[in-house]
C-alpha cells in the first residue's frame, strides 16, 4: 500500500509538472505584466539566514509560501518576481523549478543539489553561501531584479528551457 501511495504521488507530481509547464507556455507573455516587487520564499525550509535576509531591509515585501491552497500559491508565484530558497536541496527540487515556471528569478544557496549546476541550473550570481557578509549582496540583487526584471529573468533561460524540455521520468 505504501508503494501504491508513492506511485500515486509520482503520478500527481507528473500531472502537476505538466500543468505548470502548460501554464507557463500559455501565459509566458502575460506573466511579466503580473509581476510586483515581491519576494516569495519557502517558509517550511526557512532558517536563521532567511530571516536575516528578511530583516536586513524592511522595505522589501517578503511573503512566505506556507498554508496556501494551490490557487493561492499559484497567484503568489505569478505576482512575485523572486523566489528565495535557502533550505537544503535533496535533489532536483520541485519548488524552485515551479517558481521559475511562474516567472520568478530564483535566488538560492549551494546546499545539496543546488551545489551542482546540472541539478539547479541557476547562474552562480544568483547563488550565495549562507554567510552574513553576503546579506548586502543579496539585498542588492533583489533590487537589481526589482528594477530590471526582464533582463534578470532572461538569465534564468537555460534553467527554464531545461525544465520545459525534460521528460517527466528525468525528474524522479
Where are these regions (language model features)?
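Short, contiguous strand/loop micro-motifs
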Residues: 60, 82-83, 115
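Conserved catalytic-core segment of nucleotide-activated headgroup transferases in glycan assembly
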Residues: 1-73
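Glycine-rich anion-binding loop/nest that anchors nucleotide
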Residues: 64-67, 83-91
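Short, intrinsically disordered, charge-balanced linker/junction segments flanking boundaries
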Residues: 81, 166-171
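Well-ordered, non-membrane alpha-helical segments in soluble/globular domains
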Residues: 48-49, 135-141, 170-172
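Glycine-rich phosphate-binding loop at the start of an alpha helix
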Residues: 74, 93-94
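Short alpha-helical donor nucleotide-sugar binding micro-motif in glycosyltransferases
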Residues: 75-80
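Catalytic binding pocket for nucleotide-activated donors in carbohydrate/polymer assembly enzymes
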Residues: 86-88, 94-164
